[in-house]
UniProtKB/Swiss-Prot annotation:
Record field: compositional bias (Basic and acidic residues): 475-489
Purpose of the protein: Component of the regulatory network controlling carbon source utilization through ubiquitination and deubiquitination involving creA, creB, creC, creD and acrB. May be involved in signaling by recognizing appropriately phosphorylated substrates via its arrestin domains and then recruit a HECT-type ubiquitin ligase such as hulA, leading to ubiquitination of the substrate, providing a link between ubiquitination and phosphorylation in protein regulation and stability.
Region described as Disordered: spans on this chain: 374-397, 455-489
PANTHER family noted in UniProt: ARRESTIN DOMAIN CONTAINING PROTEIN, FI21816P1
Descriptive protein name: Probable HECT-type ubiquitin ligase-interacting protein creD
SMART domains: Arrestin_C
A cellular component annotation (GO) from this entry: plasma membrane
Amino acid sequence: MALSFFGGGGASHLKYFDIRLDEDYIVFRGGEQEAASAQLSGKLLLCLSEPLSAKHVRLNLTGISRVCWHLPSSSASGGRKSWREKVFYEKSWTFRDAGKSKTEILAAGNYEFPFHVILEGSMPESVEGLSDTYVTYRFKAEIGRKYAKDIVVRKPLRIIRTLDSSALELSHAMSVENIWPNKIEYSISTPTKAVIFGTSIRVDFKLIPLLKGLKIGQIVSQLIESHDLTLNPEDPDSVRNTYKNTRTIVNDEHELDEENNLEIIDEAAEGYQFSRFLDLPKTLTRCLQDTDTRGIKIRHKLKFRVQLLNPDGHISELRATLPVSIFISPNLAIDDNNNLVDQTPQSAQRAVNDLAQQAPPLYGEHQFDQLYSEVDPSGYRTPGPGSGPGTPFGTLSRNLSAENLASMNALTNTDISASALHSRLSNLHASRFSNPSPADTDGHTDVEHRRLGVSADYFGPSSGSNSHSPASPELSRRPSDEGYHDHDHIPSGMATPFHPQFAEVESLSRVPSYSTAVRSTVGPCDSELPDYQAVVAEDTAMPTLQSPQQAHIRSAGRGASTGHTGIDVHHLRSGLFNSRTSAHHDDDDRRLRLVQARARV
């Protein structure tokens, strides 16, 4: 290929001269403001059979943009042509330079001149396919000669700007649905807004006639490409000459077989539900990618027309439009003539599959989620049936449990498998309904712990009975409800309310008033918070409101059951009015305690 560019007598000594890139094209993922930089590297290869006299050996990379359009001619005047061409990027490498008016002799042999450059992510992508409008990059390698024609070889470079795997266009479905009163209920949708160039677009139709005797006529689906060209996009002060044009890329016509295609939709009404596939062209000359760079803006949309044959004989037409974005995938190579290298349906399907694995799955299609081996995921989905707002399963919620987190270190140091852990969790969930005796539960737990080599306090009562044990002075969580209604034998988290009601949640959210708080005693600053059993015991034998010990009502409201908390609060509020009739020395005593508490703080 390179030899066709050679000229002059010394060119016969040149056996090989070419530009070899490490990557066939450069890929930017994301828009111009978010894409990361990319490295372009390669080698300039030279093979000489005999010595060659040369002034220099150079390599240039040039980025050129051109915007041009032709206005149609009329009878009054001829056609008018508007155009603008600009070099927006240049990079040069000089491998050999003999100096001004000098030459050097390149000995016979093989030469490799490596080169590399960092391309910013904001660089324009290649736009090729239109006759006089483009954005291109070209390499030009040159061997300068003094008394002969220069030896030149050229190579194009394609820069692709594709979508990032987290782009919303890859996961958001596009749909238009509405009801034409007394005519038809319709829904037209596409699985995603973004479509890979060279593949196909799937369009899903759902048509439900609302008028008896209404028939569906011809259904036309079109892919429209719009061109918006601007001569001076960078200069806001100059006259912005613009030109707009559209062309039809795909035209699909379909007619329903009313007898065979009629079906029951959503178990409610009879209608038609089907899909159509619009195959995209395999060449950029017939279909461009969506872009907006260097005064060239390309956009695509789907237009639909559905004929409705009314019973009275007149014809109505339903029209709808959906936006669609076409992008070039790096997995489908494009040759120098702007055609797909592999145009088989299998290659297009592979590109779609690769894209599906890179993009995050849809909410209902999480087939790529990683699961633990041999773990049955049934029962682990939250919220469960009948669950309250934002409430997960009681036995599976770690936020509501009071397990000893320090004891989990023993679990991580053993070779326990995920299946064994799942078995223990399943047994724990089942024990909530069977309620075995404390002796049987302890015996079974000890045997299981010895078999697995795990400390006995894991899932044990000590996890919730004392959240401030020496084994875990800091790693603790808010205790659950065990211990108040005779649940001391139930492991941590087993007495968590399974379906908390709104009234219980409201009771748990109550906070003592300021007047209640000032009458409470204040402990020393260096004292620790009371443990769960101490709070429950204190809450069971509640003192009168004249005693400052009632300050623990907030802690009891969190740890005890919801019904108990409501009684406490009601009793506390009733006592507020009775305390106003108490003796005067009680008020003085409370004021003195308050002053002492503030002094300690």
